[in-house]
Amino acid sequence: MDFDYLERFAAGDRTVIGEVLTLFREQAALWAPKLADGATGWREVVHTIKGAGRGIGATVLGDVCAEAEAVGESLLPKVRAALAEAVAAIDAYQARE
């Protein structure tokens, strides 16, 4: 996670950063079940996660999602892992604040 990216984007406003990260975490909890193997509509969810992740500086997550869009459902475990890593990084970042 590139939190510097988000900090620059939010002009250092800690309130905005906190709100954005909290919203991402809440959305991640809704996205996760939609990434189960065999889930219908997974491609749309992956596309949404790609944009949301890149928007907060989760470049690796965005790249994994782009790869899954191109390759297919077999990469959903990789997407789930990258999403979990992004959420863990957010938790650690927010714990420091």
Q: Could you tell me what each predicted segment is?
A:
Residues V46, G53, C65-A68:
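Hydrophobic helical segment of the DHp/HisKA dimerization and phosphotransfer domain
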Residues D2-T48, S74-E97:
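Long, amphipathic alpha-helical coiled-coil segments characteristic
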Residues L61-E73:
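Short helix/strand-capping connector loops at secondary-structure junctions
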